[in-house]
A protein has these predicted regions:
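Jelly-roll (double-stranded beta-helix
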Residues: 1-217
Length: 217
């Protein structure tokens, strides 16, 4: 969960939790099973205001589906910021790598999560690993992707897995969240909040939940 404005409070069955605000990230690993809840912080609920956040679900490899549940509270100061060429803007490395810079989020498979702030009129070319799945969400403003695809606020652009370059042109000041990962090429079965690799595993997850193996909040 990435917060752009407002505050989010979290707690879960590992005993972890806390409040995150603008620029902060919470990175939770469900693994073998976790109970959690997210809500406005008490202080934010009392004063009111805009809450803008992005939540991503990253599929774990089959071999890691039963990993120990975990939680990372990543503050804005923990996230490295890269100044982009030609005064184009900045890029925050939340997960994965950008050049020699590594993000703080712990991942189980190769992936990148980059939070970009682009200046109006800027042109930017980003290297992307050949064959990876790549998508971007325009959080604010508008951009043109690869010279042909305009995208405005709250729009998602899914890119082809072929090619290793991504070109962005900012039509206005813009915030863009870019997500890219190496395909797992494994079956996916989802049911409610459960995501596994087979119907049998889904049934096992439901039994674990009903028997209290996910713990308590």
């Amino acid at each position: 969960t990435i917060v752009y404005s407002g505050e989010v409070e979290h707690r879960d069955s590992t005993g972890r939790g806390g409040v995150i605000g603008p620029g902060d990230v919470q990175w939770m690993t469900a693994g073998a099973g976790i109970l959690h809840e997210e809500f406005h912080s008490s202080a934010f609920s009392q004063k009111g205001g805009e809450l803008k956040m992005m939540q991503l679900w990253v599929n774990l490899p089959a071999k890691d589906k039963m990993a120990t549940p975990g939680y990372q509270s990543i503050t804005q100061s923990d996230i490295p910021v890269v100044t982009l060429p030609d005064n184009s803007g900045t890029l925050r490395v939340i997960a994965g790598r950008f050049g020699e810079v590594t993000g703080p989020a712990h991942t189980f498979s190769p992936l990148n999560v980059w939070d970009l702030a682009l200046r109006q009129g800027s042109h930017l070319t980003l290297n992307q690993p050949e064959g990876w799945s790549t998508a971007l969400v325009v959080v604010e403003g508008s951009v043109t992707v690869n010279g042909t695809t305009p995208a405005g606020e709250a729009q998602l652009v899914v890119l082809s897995q072929s090619g290793d370059k991504l070109h962005l042109e900012a039509s206005s000041d813009a915030k863009v969240l870019l997500m890219a990962g190496e395909p797992l090429n494994e079956p996916i079965v989802g049911y409610g909040p459960f995501v596994m690799n087979s119907k049998t595993e889904i049934a096992e997850a439901i039994r674990d939940f009903n028997s209290g193996r996910f713990g308590q909040i």
